[in-house]
């Protein structure tokens, strides 16, 4: 994880091209005035049929489905883990050693919401959630 940690602020984005549409931490609700949400990751909108990509080399430790969020893949980088959610097709299996920028899976396209394709991305150090925006290059 030393290499991962040394690359803070310089990791490639988990998509080829995208824009952050949901920020980390406590955010005001877009519609409901007195409601806040506490995001444990970031939401990145990208082009339909885009792939999620590993931000650093590591080992695939989990892949599973979450109701309402399609599939999730977790990659371990020593003491760190990256989480990629809202995937449909998964290209990797548990135990795979993958490289930075390697495609992990196809991001879900929401046909009922203007064909939006949004990846939910998290970074963890052990059990402590990190702000992914502090890790990816600007």
Go through the PLM ranges and name each one.
Residues 44, 72-73, 99-112:
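Short hydrophobic beta/alpha edge segments that flank linear recognition/processing sites
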Residues 63, 80-97, 101:
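Short histidine-centered loop motifs in beta-beta connectors
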